Amino acid sequence: SMPLINSKGVRQTPWSEGQNVRHLEPMGFIKFDLLGLSTLAMMETAIELILKRHFRNDNPTFSDVKSFYDRYLHPDKIDLNDEKVYENVFHKGNFVGTFQFTEDGARNFAERVKPNNIIDVSAITSIYRPGPLSANVHEDYIEAKGSPQYIKYLTPEIQEITEETFGFLIFQEQIAKIAHALGKDLSLDEGNLLRKLLTKKGTGKGFEVKDRIHKKFIDGCIEKGIAQTEAQALWEKFEYFSGYGFNKSHAVCYSVISYQCAWLLTYYQAEWIAAFLDKEPESRKEEAINTAKSLGYSIAPVDVNTSGRTWEITKDGKTLIQPLTSIKGFGESAMIQVLEHRPFKDIEDLLFREEVKYAKLNKKVLDRLCRAGALDALVDDRFTGRKHFWSAAVVERPKTKKKFHENIEKYRGEGDFSEEEIIHFKTELTGIFPMNLVISPETIEKLKEKFIPPISEFDEELQICWFIPRKVIPKKTKRGKDYWILQVIDSNNETEKITCWGIDPKKDSIHINRPYMSRLEYDPKWGFSTRSMYRNFRLLG
């Protein structure tokens, strides 16, 4: 047993100086690596929403969440061969928020493989790494899975061990099993030792043990009728594979989590999308919102009377309500004041409620609520626009109703915010891009009539499309030449990147959040590009 001590309230194990985790196994202990995954928090949020919407549980506890998980998602209970899950997610490429499938490359690979079971998924995640990809294993694997009848196995033992991966050595455990099956008096423990030694280099004791196992393996293969050259080739395949082999137990465990995400996405899509929006980091929030829109969901703007702590779902399941927490700078203390005292029937009700603690719901918070659009529903016909409302109620924060009414008259000429201001406020404070303010549906229809599609529907023959730049990333080539990467969006809420070569920073310019029409080149590997912004870009409107 290992002794425990209590040090500053934390239980610890008293290690002797110089000892570390590598000493655990020889001493008879098992080392566990406990990893925290944000995906698990996303699953918890999704389950809470499911319990609220489908099980009439308005305040689910962690115990309630665990009960749902144990009943539907636990590895011992979930159906890992559900065709609907594989078809809906892995075959169609609908991977929203799916663990291990956040990159386009992994998604495209999975779509081409079309996995049918958890081992297929594990193989995909094991192959989609730098080593196997550089060795072109992914292409060979796709070909083999598509035509398994043409796979040739050296021996029945190898077929039994590698048939689930279509003849490929994908998992480290396969080496241990093949070495045990074909080697002369080679135990499973020695096979497992070989698995470990193959990943190490050197001429010490480990090398001597590997050399001994090598001899036993070759001798065993020869006794089983395998030619020495073929046996040696198989051994060399072991050594080559050790450069990129993956642990099966690890791969399968992680793939089960991927499958659980896919199951939630298949059977409770709205809840999963809401949880996905809630947990995505700020840097990817806009892209996540665009993904939700592309799946047919409407995004209800943030509202002081209807928005909550997290993304919520309307009763019809078609609209996702942006939370108050999505407003930058809107903290927990202000949240408590809003949730405890709403609904607010008008702006006076918000500004002068006796029980509201205005030290928490202060001018800075009100400013963010107003500019983010969360107070738009409180703008009545006394105001000439939202800027008038903002100036009277927030900028010169009135302490009395009399002062507020004076402010209404004082700032009557303010009117509304400009479109540029609204776009800036929305994107700066909430992360939602107001497409309808940037390009009108009428303009989009006219472009369609002229056969000018959005960039997501780019036609390589026409080469002309339209888009809205959202971000400019200046770059330099190895020779010091300037170029830009444009991050753009279109009416399908799909984001793309355009490489703009030959940039002259003194002459070339781009207007963010304004629609452009352009002639572009497209390469399947490198994406969209243009050789001249000056010749090929035209500002619309």
Q: What do these predicted ranges mean?
A:
Residues S1-G541:
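Noncatalytic, beta-rich nucleic-acid-contacting surfaces in large DNA/RNA-processing enzymes
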